[in-house]
Amino acid sequence: MNNLIKSKLELLPTSPGCYIHKDKNGTIIYVGKAKNLRNRVRSYFRGSHDTKTEALVSEIVDFEFIVTESNIEALLLEINLIKENKPKYNIMLKDDKSYPFIKITNERYPRLIITRQVKKDGGLYFGPYPDVGAANEIKRLLDRIFPFRKCTNPPSKVCFYYHIGQCMAHTICKKDEAYFKSMAQEVSDFLKGQDDKIIDDLKSKMAVAAQSMEFERAAEYRDLIQAIGTLRTKQRVMAKDLQNRDVFGYYVDKGWMCVQVFFVRQGKLIERDVNLFPYFNDPDEDFLTYVGQFYQEKSHLVPNEVLIPQDIDEEAVKALVDSKILKPQRGEKKQLVNLAIKNARVSLEQKFNLLEKSVEKTQGAIENLGRLLQIPTPVRIESFDNSNIMGTSPVSAMVVFVNGKPSKKDYRKYKIKTVVGPDDYASMREVIRRRYGRVQREALTPPDLIVIDGGQGQVNIAKQVIQEELGLDIPIAGLQKNDKHQTHELLFGDPLEVVDLSRNSQEFFLLQRIQDEVHRFAITFHRQLRSKNSFSSQLDGIDGLGPKRKQNLMRHFKSLTKIKEASVDEIVEVGVPRVVAEAVQRKLNPQGEALPQVAEERVDYQTEGNHNEP
């Protein structure tokens, strides 16, 4: 705590208000509210805190405060300050998720559309729906029943929808406005759950069609009735009064809060909104902040009622939401709030369970591996593999795992420079010498463990270079594969021995992932190099076609076959002079001969870890 903060802490009033924490750059990193500014702000700089609060406090170099007349005024100010400044430590509805609505437009001849924007334009809005797929499903059903116009600008001729019975083509059939308003009312009734009349009408039409032996049309009516029934079953009735309401529940544990919002429309639970985030203040105060942001940021209609838990300040919510606010004591409304709270608890428990499993797969795996090999926990593991075909285009690759996860920015690729022919041991010697010679020269941080994709011979070569040539003390292990090319044994120690490692353990799965990844990276690099070399050999000896133009051709056409099939004009468009383009075509198409198979391979010059060690 610096002297500026110490001085300001002495000046804090006991009034309600907002406080604003800033970092060394003057950036606002957190906005909070308090009933008593002095007590709240001082609490950040006294005593111990959990990890997330310690992280916040470590960045605070200054703070400001704004006094308000009441705690509710402080709440409203806090929400506006968060919206304006977007502090990184505050609760933020970052995705600004907007839900789809079905809308009947306020036009002379109305349309039925899906929108995410609710406007005061006289249109009728129904929703929100959980996603655009659910909204489209209902709209498709409505389109089959109600022939609203589909075109934004009505055409002079009838459209496709007219021919399939989904548009009245009002410019031709001359239905009056009253007809369409009546149809809009039927849709409104349907979306409010009053669909019995529509089903009765469809049943009557189905019976008439069947009596007239129009069986295809009768089947269409039957399918519509079944579709309505299916839609009904998907929407569970949660309240008998068929009202629209949002139901809030929250749960806190281990410094995290989960808020669940149930969207109940016409008594049916149609969707829920789930948000999990760390909290820094009293849970009920951070919950109020969330509610304020929810209705300020979300594009969704405020319902007739909002149900909240018992421990929340009802008057504060009323200041945030222009709706009837209830804290139900009993009955089905109380059950709805309890259900939202229960779901919030389950969601938070699932988050912690997933975190524990993730730690078990990564941090737990490297800790167990360290104990098994009797070395410090191998936070950073570097693994090597070689790749060549009969000694051609020999390469090696290194992948890096940090805390049990791949760190692709640290991957490295090596072209073998000193080895002639297929000599895996010599290739391993070269790449280990190059990598750790550089680590030694540039004082880079060495890994905690080196894993060689290979058996005893490759591991011993690596040991010779690391320990005898370079004098480094880095543990080295080897991963042997079986005859099915699967991870089989872990070799470690001096002399090397097979480590007793359970094939069902997380540490074995980690080593398996490392071996698979380094093999993938090495073989991918080898294929790229081999294809590139084949490409170069095919175009060698053409005057005016240097390395840069060859590379441009490959980037544009992707393969020799595509270049061979291209016209001279198309090659010229890549920046190759016409005389050179003609020479390329003559070289690649001598009397119509076919190109070798390898020319079909594509080359991608942009891969992860696209770095070559010296």
UniProtKB/Swiss-Prot annotation:
Annotated Basic and acidic residues bias: 599-614
Cellular compartment(s): Cytoplasm
Name of the protein described by the UniProt record: UvrABC system protein C
Assembly with partners or alone: Interacts with UvrB in an incision complex.
Keyword entries, A-Z: Cytoplasm, DNA damage, DNA excision, DNA repair, Excision nuclease, SOS response
Residue span(s) of domain GIY-YIG: 14-91
UVR domain ranges (all copies): 196-231
Organism: Streptococcus pneumoniae (strain P1031)
Location (main, coarse): cytoplasm
CDD domains: GIY-YIG_UvrC_Cho
The keyword Repressor belongs to this UniProt entry's keyword annotation: no
